[in-house]
């Protein structure tokens, strides 16, 4: 079903711009540089199609395959480039990543410390990536469809970002996150 009253919707003061959008879709060709994506915001990047070559901070460089989720904190050294044509959805966060009204990533780190006798497991040499479960694949598929149709108001973006965080908290363990 097409979006109704599209002109009214697009003329609204709350219609998201490239600068204000909390979600953006990227359909990129081979060897496209994406190194500035986390310059002003932290980014949760879902790779729906293709591959990315990524270096993040002091971690070992690695190739990210489709179906993976990667967190790119703001202002951490990051270089990224597409391998072949790629499609991904980026979710931008200004502050902490709120996983629900009760937890954010810092709270989860505290919970993991409590479970492990106040010690975190030793850091990996490779930055973490998360395989996307079918519930998140469905979420991103619906989100992509809605954005393609032009449903792009800031209220929609905020609600979908809250939904994403609740799904992450609901379908993944503390250690996974």
Where are each of the predicted segments found?
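A short, N-terminal "cap"/entry segment at the start of jelly-roll beta-barrel domains
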Residues: 1-18, 149
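Generic signal for short, ordered secondary-structure residues
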Residues: 2, 29, 46, 122, ...
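Short, charged, low-complexity loops and linkers
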Residues: 2-4, 114-125, 174
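Histidine (H) residue identity feature
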Residues: 4, 9, 41, 66, ...
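Hydrophobic alpha-helices of bacterial signal-transduction systems
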Residues: 6-12, 59-61, 128
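N-terminal regulatory/effector-sensing and dimerization cores
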Residues: 15-121
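An amphipathic alpha-helical interaction segment
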Residues: 123-177
């Amino acid at each position: 079903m097409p979006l109704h009253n599209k002109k009214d919707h697009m003329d609204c003061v709350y219609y998201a711009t490239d600068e204000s959008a909390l979600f953006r879709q990227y359909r990129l060709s081979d060897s496209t540089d994406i190194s500035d994506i986390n310059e002003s915001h932290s980014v949760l990047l879902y790779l729906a199609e293709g591959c990315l070559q990524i270096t993040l901070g002091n971690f070992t460089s690695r190739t990210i395959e489709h179906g993976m989720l990667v967190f790119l904190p703001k202002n951490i050294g990051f270089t990224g480039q597409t391998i072949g044509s790629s499609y991904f959805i980026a979710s931008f966060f200004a502050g902490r990543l709120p996983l629900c009204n009760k937890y954010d990533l810092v709270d989860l780190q505290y919970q993991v410390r409590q479970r492990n006798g106040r010690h975190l497991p030793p850091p990996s040499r490779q930055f973490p990536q998360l395989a996307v479960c079918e519930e998140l694949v469905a979420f991103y598929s619906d989100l992509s469809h809605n954005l393609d149709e032009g449903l792009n108001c800031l209220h929609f973006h905020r609600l979908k970002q809250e939904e994403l965080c609740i799904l992450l908290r609901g379908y993944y363990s503390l250690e996974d996150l």
